[in-house]
């Protein structure tokens, strides 16, 4: 059985802090599922699809920044370096799923 972590949020928008948590989770789990929730009681700036795309783009940016870290001047922590290496080897170690039901139901469906 795979060791799967689940990280839920609205990610409206995704931040550097969110990516830091994903990186930390990648050091503890074989796979990390990022659950993007829909909360009807909150006014969302971006649609579910846009938020999922933003997370993918942020992960791409993280890989790019790591590749060119000497040029961009961003310092990576050891856990970020480890996580980026995992992402470069296997982008499938992070899966992004949208959901509108209970977080626990999405986590269970995802195998976390």
Regions found by a protein language model. Give the residues of each.
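Nucleotidyltransferase catalytic core that binds NTPs
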Residues: 1-112
């Amino acid at each position: 059985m795979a060791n799967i972590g689940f990280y839920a949020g609205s990610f409206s928008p995704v931040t550097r802090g969110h990516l830091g948590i994903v990186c930390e989770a990648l050091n503890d789990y074989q796979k990390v599922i990022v659950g993007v929730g829909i909360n009807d009681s909150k006014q969302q700036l971006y649609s579910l699809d846009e938020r999922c795309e933003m997370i993918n783009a942020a992960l791409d940016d993280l890989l790019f920044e790591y590749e060119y870290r000497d040029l961009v001047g961003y310092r990576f922590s050891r856990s970020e370096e480890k996580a980026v290496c995992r992402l470069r080897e296997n982008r499938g170690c992070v899966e992004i799923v949208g959901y509108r039901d209970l977080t626990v139901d999405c986590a269970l469906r995802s195998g976390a």
